[in-house]
Amino acid sequence: MRTVGGVVVLVTGTALMLGLLSGCGSGGGGARKRGAFPPSARPSSAPPSVSPTPAPSGAKTVNPEEKWDGKVRILGDGSTSSTGPQPHQPKPVKLKPGEKPPQFLVFSWDGALQGDDEQFSHFREVAKENNAQMTFFLTGTYLLPKSMASKCRPPQHKRGEMAILYATDQHIRDTLEQLRGAWLEGDEIGTHFNGHFCGAKGGGDWSVAEWKSEIEQSYSFVENWKTNTGYKDLPPLPFDYRKELAGGRAPCLEGQKNLLKAAKSFGWRYDASSPGDFQIWPSKNDGIWNFPLQLVPYPGTERQVLSMDFNFLYNQSGERTQGDPVEYEQWRKLTRDSYLNGFERVYNGSRAPLFIGNHFEDWNGGIYMKAVEDVVESVCKRDGVRCVTFKQLADWLDVQDPQVLAKMRQLDPAQSPDWKSLVK
């Protein structure tokens, strides 16, 4: 173990396991403060057991069990609304005997700010062009103007204090537009919580009650953005956040133990705050689906790297977010090929879902954004592949036979079983 720039790096055997840093991407008001990325825990070293924006064109797919009376209701101060079931949601279907599971991929984004680089809107387009849907983990305070900082009461910190910068007024407006459009396109709006505190007095030190406070504030910033911003000219978000929010990812992946206890009281269905694991089928942690980032093979080495942009950055340019431009193209290909290696391993093997996490950032000339885009374009239209949200994956897992899922969890990532004998 060694510490570099406040980041703990652990090297064990053939796998380089980096502390995962779920920071907030670049883009004007979304810039992070210096030192906002302290260390996180490593994955287990044990091997796996062997007028609102109009909806996009196309049919509206809804859960038939979700009833709606057809009436749009404005909620609270007009920040949100109830417009019925979310459009473009696939109906989860139980595997038939002998059926091979779909190959699921989940692309998720921490922070979800529409900054000057307009990456939120860009990746919405990438998703639409490739039959994909994505999860956007919103930092709640990105809807809170700095002038209203006193509304933010972070656990163990002063009122209004943040480890990241407040968004500009224009970025708040732009982010609201993106959230509205993303939900109507079938994307998921999850949470990255609020102040992005890590390390001492961060999420890892918070009690269950403090996590509950953080979660309540996550709801409040979305449900009261009109009051907080004074933007009366904008339409409400087309969803009831109390009903839609199903999970999130904690900053720096810290504090999952107490977070899960708090999340359960809100009825959340999954959590993506695990510090990492192998590519195996998910399991539940105290009734909540655990969706960790995963170790994927790094080309030309025996190492595996966790499936998030910062981990590739560290492998390639260390602490520098802008390394040698001569290396950018090679680094982009290595990052892309790592993700594709992880994909091919399970696509031709266990079919365990692949989770890829990212930020809206421009590190090393934006190569990590391009690598993710390359992967979306390469795999999301392939036979048997479904690029979905975490919420949609939870829907699918919930209708499967628990005994079949238990057998699938025993598979090594590259192990291709006899599906006819496994799925009964």
Task: List each language-model region with its residue ranges.
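Short, hinge-like loop/turn segments at secondary-structure boundaries
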Residues: C152-P155, V208, A406
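Short aromatic-enriched loop/helix-cap "lid" or pocket-rim segments at secondary-structure transitions
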Residues: S147-S150, G202, L259-A262, K284, ...
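Alpha-helical scaffold elements lining the catalytic groove of polysaccharide deacetylases
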Residues: D117, G195-D233, S283-N348, Y368
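Active-site beta->alpha N-cap acidic-glycine motif
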Residues: W68-E188, G195-G199, Q217-F221, W225-K261, ...
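N-terminal export and membrane-targeting signals
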Residues: M1-T14
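C-terminal domain-boundary segment and adjacent tail
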Residues: S81, T135, Y270-S283, D337-K424
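Glycine-enriched alpha-helix->loop->beta-strand junction motifs that scaffold or abut catalytic
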Residues: G186, K264-D271, N285-I288
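N-terminal low-complexity, Pro/Thr-rich disordered segments
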Residues: L18-K91
